[in-house]
Swiss-Prot record:
Coiled coil: none annotated. The keyword Transport applies. The record marks E125 as: Reversibly protonated during proton transport. The gene is ATP5MC3. It comes from Pongo abelii. This is ATP synthase F(0) complex subunit C3, mitochondrial. GO terms for cellular component: mitochondrial membrane; proton-transporting ATP synthase complex; proton-transporting two-sector ATPase complex, proton-transporting domain.
Length: 142
């Protein structure tokens, strides 16, 4: 791959590309240095500048697509983080189901089982809220 890039890129294209990289796009499009150059070296420079202007046009064309991809990735990430809230609901159901089964087996341990159930409920709910917080961070903070 490096050999292909080395053959395809001339030094003038690399210089022109690095010059465009730190300039604003409007300045790169509006100021055409190939108009002021003449002679044998200008053909290579014109080819390099045309390649750079094609890259600039491609940037204008794909910026909307890039934004759409970023938005879709945000929604997918937020949806994946929201799955943790469903896991929290399943965990809470398991905790209180185990409380009922434990109380049915040994009613004398009612107070101790209930305190463990409250602890399990709190931990499961905290994980659900954490997943919901991450989903909102993905949607609105990124």
């Amino acid at each position: 791959m490096f050999a292909c890039a080395k053959l395809a890129c001339t030094p003038s294209l690399i210089r022109a590309g690095s010059r465009v990289a730190y300039r604003p796009i409007s300045a790169s499009v509006l100021s055409r240095p190939e108009a002021s150059r003449t002679g044998e070296g200008s053909a290579v420079f014109n080819g390099a500048q045309n390649g750079v202007s094609q890259l600039i046009q491609r940037e204008f064309q794909t910026s909307a697509i890039s934004r759409d991809i970023d938005t879709a990735a945000k929604f997918i990430g937020a949806g994946a983080a929201t799955v943790g809230v469903a896991g929290s609901g399943a965990g809470i159901g398991t905790v209180f189901g185990s409380l009922i089964i434990g109380y049915a087996r040994n009613p004398s341990l009612k107070q101790q089982l209930f305190s463990y159930a409250i602890l399990g409920f709190a931990l499961s709910e905290a994980m659900g809220l954490f997943c919901l917080m991450v989903a909102f961070l993905i949607l609105f903070a990124m």
